[in-house]
């Protein structure tokens, strides 16, 4: 009974906080003009945790404002990839609000090095398709976003001496590698797994639609 109440409470909060925009850090309950962290969209943890509830709660329509916001910032995401990493495709920053440019630079939190954003959000696109089986959505919205995310890795990844691809620089949000004073690292597990999930999903989606063969 307790777990059911917790689920229902979370579902109520998420539905209430979602409108034409996805829920930000404080939802609609900030009650101040200066909320913590500016009440932004923290994309490297907070926002994905919230939107991951949508499909489980049988509210797939609430995913659409997230996709609308991401697609509105596609040109900014392309600027991030090109100007910061000299790569094709898109780079979703660790935070955004009124634009999608990656301008959060900090000596302690190397958020610029977080690579998993576009890949992680691509998985939400593919999850939405798997839940709804909407092939028009897969063709017109999901796969184009996923392809742009994959293009980034085509340029970014370099092959190491052992034949394996290297993610460098890399960053797992708010995690310090062992025996290191810096959170910046090489081959953060989060970055590797996000790219793995993205590329597998691109292959599956392409097979479903009969494209990219």
Q: Where is each model-derived feature located?
A:
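Extended, hydrophobic/aromatic-rich amphipathic alpha-helical segments that build helical scaffolds
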Residues: 3-17, 118-127, 143-153
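Structural recognition of the beta-strand scaffold that forms the well-ordered cores
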Residues: 5-6, 13-15, 52-53, 61-65, ...
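Alpha-helical support elements that line or immediately flank enzyme active sites
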Residues: 13-16, 47-61, 115, 119-135
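The feature captures the catalytic groove of carbohydrate-active enzymes
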Residues: 24-40, 88-140, 154-213
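Extended, well-ordered alpha-helical scaffold segments
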Residues: 6-9, 62-73, 137-153, 198, ...
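Loop/turn elements at helix/coil->beta-strand transitions in domains of secreted/extracellular proteins
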Residues: 2, 9, 59, 134, ...
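Acidic/polar, glycine-enriched structural segments that form the non-catalytic walls/loops
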Residues: 1-41, 59-64, 70-80, 210
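Glycine-rich (often Gly-Gly/Gly-Pro-rich) flexible segments and glycine-rich loop motifs
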Residues: 42-84, 187-205, 210-211
């Amino acid at each position: 009974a307790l777990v059911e109440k917790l689920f229902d409470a979370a579902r109520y909060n998420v539905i209430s906080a979602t409108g034409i925009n996805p829920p930000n850090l404080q939802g609609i309950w900030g009650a101040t003009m200066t909320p913590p962290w500016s009440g932004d969209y923290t994309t490297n943890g907070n926002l994905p945790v919230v939107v991951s509830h949508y499909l489980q709660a049988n509210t797939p329509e609430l995913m659409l404002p997230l996709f609308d916001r991401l697609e509105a910032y596609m040109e900014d995401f392309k600027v991030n990839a090109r100007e910061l990493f000299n790569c094709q495709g898109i780079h979703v920053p660790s935070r955004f609000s009124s634009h999608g440019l990656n301008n959060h630079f900090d000596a302690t939190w190397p958020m610029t090095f977080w690579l998993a954003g576009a890949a992680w959000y691509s998985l939400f696109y593919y999850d939405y398709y798997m839940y709804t089986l909407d092939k028009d959505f897969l063709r017109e919205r999901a796969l184009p976003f996923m392809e742009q995310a994959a293009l980034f890795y085509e340029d970014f990844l370099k092959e190491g001496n052992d034949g394996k691809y290297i993610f460098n620089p890399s960053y797992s949000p708010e995690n310090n590698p062992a025996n290191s004073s810096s959170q910046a690292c090489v081959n953060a597990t989060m970055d590797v797994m996000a790219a793995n999930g993205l590329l597998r999903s691109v292959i599956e989606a392409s097979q479903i639609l009969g494209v990219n063969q």
